[in-house]
Amino acid sequence: MLTVTGLWFDHERTPVGLDHTPVFGWQLEGNCRNIRQTQYRLQVALTPDFAALLYDETCETGNSTAVHAAGLTLQSLQKYYARVQVWADTAAGPQQTLWSEPAVFITALLDPAAEWKAEFVSAESPETCRKSSAGTMVRAAFTVKPGLRAAYACTTALGLYNVYLNGQKVSTDEMTPGWTSYNRRLLYQTYEVTAMLHPGLNMAGAMLGAGWYKGVMGLTRSRNNYGDTTAFAMQLTLVYADGTRETVNTGPAWQGTKAPVIFSEIYHGEAYDAALELPHWAECETPENTPAGRWHAVHTVPYPAAKLAAQAAGKVCVQQRIPAQRVFTAPDGSIVVDFGQNMAGRVEITVQGTAGQAAELRCFEELDADGNPYLANLRKARTTMQYTFARSQTVTWQPQFTYMGFRYALVVQWPGKPEPANFTACVLHSAMQPAGEFTCSEPLVNQLNHNILWGLKSNFLDVPTDCPQRDERLGWTGDAQIFCETACWLADTWTFYSKWLKDLAVDQLPDGGVANVVPNIEETHTEANWLMKNCPYGASGWGDAATVIPWVLYQMYGDDTILRSQYPSMKRWVDFMRANTQNGLFDFKMQLGDWVALDAEPGSYFGATPTALTSQAYYALSAQLLALAAEVLGNRQDAELYARVHRQAAQDFAANFFTLDGAMTAQTQTAHILALRFGLTPQKWKQKTIQRLLELLEQQNGHLVTGFLGTPYFCAALSQNGCWQQAYDLMLKKDYPGWLYQVLQGATTVWEHWDGRRPDGTMWSAGMNSFNHYAYGAVGAWLYGECAGIGQQPGTAGFCAARLAPRPGGGLRWAQAWHQTPFGRYALQWQVDDGKITVTAAIPPNAAAKICLEPGAKLLETDGLTFAEQNGCPTAQVSSGQYRVSYTMEQ
């Protein structure tokens, strides 16, 4: 039976707080082959019985993944119900589904500049706020009349906040409102809170922390980067049965006081003094929660409503809870808690103590060669959490307004003897659905894939950060763009990246240059840091996040809305590069190039590949992607213009970086990788370039010496040019430098440096030695797309037409992967058994694929498929369903 599943809105199942009409999509499920949608009927209504229809449209189309409901008009702060019915052709004949289960989305304020009336209120003292990182609380009582039908709270803060109604935390969200360039864009969250209110007197309250807004942040460790006063704003809309609406807004009538959070910052952790608690403080006033002199009037803080933007999904919350594996005493006498996994988040403690006693932990990543806590790589970050008791009791507590990167926790203070049961790690990251899994016969590669995934989890906390542990944790654009494709294989990152790309665009400089970190917290401090002073923005491979990430998202999800929204930003970046060319080559200030490559001069972070070469390669790539985006959007004039820009950039690359006999002027691995991967090698010199890359690899005994820009593409540059064995050999290297070396050293996430920990247990320089740095995990895309073999046919997007091309090798007995696409799940497995290779493939309904076997494959089983040779490979065109074929290789 054919059914509709997973109706979504803007790639989310149940978004709350949309400020626009969403894009719709759905998936089909059926137990027969060749399912192809021919027609759909989409309805949107105000009630779950669909009696109050707002939209009812039937379309003859196969489109099921990026459907626009033209003519649908939405209202602010309203719940909507949607359902879809589908007609399809199948191998069993035409079929029609029943209506899908109703799916729900809720709108935010569609025009906050006009509709937002709430003021930002603060309980901080103007005399002390600039130096304070203490928390505060604000609250106010309000009355709800009988007949309440719905209630929606729109909330945000300058700083971090948790909001409560009648003593109950409104949501499980953490670290709200997230991190943006607050002076340009501030997100607000929308919550349906009907069930939390009752007729009569109610109480609203919020607790605030310094967060990214005013705490110490950035390479210069500056504070008050966006302002010096935390403030909270709430606009609570009450909708009554008769249709009338009223609002409860923050304003001067609210009251404030100090919170038991006496200190909280992103880098340094949090301290909590239970003596300052007010029990039931966010409930209606009692003598207990309203002691004389404790609450005082708030003051208002101006903020333009026009800069507010709704956040409907992708918010940070506790995604996993990991119990401690052991508590042990290190050789130096330190008491250490081990959670067995490097991660980002907090530690929840359950502890018994008496008044004045404290429980204090310091989170860290690694043990040194002697088995003692290794803290040096945290630099100035204190990463400490402390709870001080007010009376004799047992408490369960975790920080609210900070997070740490850690596997271990050093017990600094503890009443009694700590046991594993006292500690639970709470993993924090932005909400994302899993999108794929890769496994193979080599356990070390499986652990590598695990490490890559945990690098994503640890660094996708509202923004794509470089690392979660030290005093940095910034949204480096280069790291983000090189990891983006891998991230999309692992998780549904559409919402996460879409949010961050808006931040990138608003932080773009007037000349079109892109900041090296987004949000650009460093923009007013560049003179205080050597790197930022010499390379304040416009770094190739970093700024190209403006073009690469939107294009990758379009390719992976097939939704051109990301190109439409980001196209002005993409164009400004390419025009910035065009305006800063000298003799045909992009040249702007100091460039970072192949950052931390192993072929760098001793003591330098700059790889041996000339930055002029890496800059020109990315200039050509970005111009090409912009031309392709313009083509998708129907902008023929721009498509032709930037195609010419790309051709000229490629010609200038060849003229400057190839000699007359076809040798590259830079004899580095990265130079050859980028030339091949970006299509910048003149065809007549392609084989020579491939051969020279193999020679450079052999000179290093099969090891890479590449940095940030070369490493992500190394395996693909080999395999896509026929060098499969070398690609597998590179991936499977077990000694330094290589991906599996880290695994054998006990890594549970990907490291910043290939030798972060050396075989003798000594460490790389503590100044830059993160053990949770996802950049080199970009090789994950190769595992899914090349090793397992799930790819797309040229000229397509969103996996409407896949190319399933398994390529056994490397001595692996089997490999398998699945990937969740807008159409549903693709799965591919290959297995080698005594010379026989068996391939099992699954294609979701309404999609199609080509199964492309290895050149020289001699078919044994075809499962009814017809294979014909294409480009030297036995190839079969298939529609949805499950297939199993087998073959041997001709000798």
Regions found by a protein language model. Name each.
Residues I35, L98, G135, T156, ...:
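Active-site-proximal structural scaffolding
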Residues M1-K79, R83-R470, G478-D479, T495-F496, ...:
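Extracellular/oxidizing-compartment recognition motifs
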Residues L160, A233, G251-A253, T257-K258, ...:
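Active-site acid/base region of carbohydrate-active enzymes
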Residues A204, L208, Y272-D273, P279, ...:
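C-terminal capping/lid segments that line or modulate ligand- or cofactor-binding pockets
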Residues Y161, V170-T172, P177, L504, ...:
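Active/binding-pocket-proximal capping segment
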Residues N224, D228-Q235, T247-T286, A309-K315, ...:
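Non-catalytic C-terminal accessory modules of carbohydrate-active enzymes
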Residues A151-T155, L165, R346-E365, F401, ...:
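Alpha-helical support elements that line or immediately flank enzyme active sites
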Residues I106-L110, D173, A617-N635:
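Conserved, charged catalytic cores of large soluble enzymes
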